[in-house]
């Protein structure tokens, strides 16, 4: 389908032990979960819904996908190089949901529950209802996640000061978190005629939580944080039969926090209460136009305007009657504007060669930066014969930092030894990417790519030379370069066994010539391999055993070294009752407790070792569908730049 590879997700997952949209996506060739996020062919990917990007963060989008039953997915479009009309950056996964109407009014639904046990227990309850009429469809979903979590972090820091003194600071931190996450979505659609429809969607979440940390060793500390974030998002999308698409979206996000800390450090003490809040108002409007012309030509153009206001504050109050060097109280208000205007064309040469090219002009404005960028995207797809697809893509795009990262705020971790500071001078990063993808027999996928990213930003750690403090700060590097090869190969033995093997090899280089007083230019070659196995034990009732594994070799990130890691998961799914309405799943994740990466630093006098806990998860889930339940879905909000 043009520059997209379209997958029948229902057929791919119908006998696999997955029960939500997020896990269903991991069954697609080349889609791999890394650090809790979905990647495509070894690179980060943007997930969009029904062709539209939203204001939800990646973390919120992940939670939404995990609460959506897999049966609501119609198909999935994989784009290694998304055209400008999608207004996304680089690789893209477009989920198309079922939006059904019916000649007779119909109400269907599903109830779902899961119990998950690691060190502590967690739960989820979910209910979905879908109404289908002749013209109107209404879709409602509510989910409630709640429970406790526990983790430990052991840190050994060999801290050298400029006066020649060296301090060994060893800490052991225990963290306990309890909380709730309520999510609700209501989507209403009305079909006036073919290719003429209006959809309005509301999404809301409320996730109060409390975390308590205790640190012992060289530092003794008690720390607590209460969070109370709210999200409201409403979006409207109107498609007209002559190719016009207009829409608008509004997002409100409010995240108040209260922190308390009492610490005895190697060189002093720290006692305070801190109150902070991030409040965002984000508006977006867009208009798009597609023309289908003669002789296989197509033309598209459009514009998107988004504006956001960030009104945030942070206050510190000492809890002892002695002088302390606490951060200043700060209240900040910032506005950001982004304008994206694009035009593109496509040409189909007898279903053998398909060209899709576009050029976007993007304007970015905030109190620190004011700039225009030209963002070209080119895709050329050659189909020499049935079952063979060769695709070349080139693109350039910009990525913007989180709102909180560009505020001049300060907070603490590890009992006050770690100081997290903002960076108002952060610049957007600009990536240039080229890739070549070959699909053999419509199932084997081979891919090679190269990317160059100017002003790459990420959070770094630095041991200060004049004081016993570690500074965590999001900084711009000179550049990052990546070159990689990926192969995704499906395997099958009769009707009883099927599998997907994904092999990935990457060369990575990162350079920062002004990283404090220790500039770096580091590179490494690493590999990652995943194997997803499904054993089909019985058809009546339908019983499937899934055993999945992943291993990743040593990698790096700035001055960090990332040791090898991996995990093995298993799940047993049973579908029973009439029309397989009931589904029972038993699972165990991270069986050998090896998934956690324990980073360390040993670079130009900086030395740090971390050992973080990793607990296996086992649990059981049950779902029951009623009323010939088939699902549909709505779109999501990009909250990737909100405070987490």
What are the residue ranges of the model-derived segments?
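N-terminal periplasmic accessory domains that precede
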Residues: 1, 21-24, 61-63, 88-112, ...
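Extracytoplasmic beta-strand/coil segments of soluble accessory domains associated
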Residues: 22-57, 85, 93
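Transmembrane beta-strands of outer-membrane beta-barrel pores
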Residues: 113-119, 133, 144-148, 204-208, ...
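Outer-membrane beta-barrel signature, preferentially recognizing the C-terminal barrel domain
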Residues: 398-448, 452, 470-484, 489-492, ...
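Short acidic/polar hinge/loop motifs at secondary-structure boundaries
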Residues: 54-80
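Gram-negative outer-membrane beta-barrel transporters
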Residues: 478-553
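Face-selective signature of the C-terminal outer-membrane beta-barrel domain
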Residues: 136, 181-208, 224-373, 381-387, ...
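Conserved C-terminal beta-signal and adjacent last beta-strands/turns
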Residues: 523-644
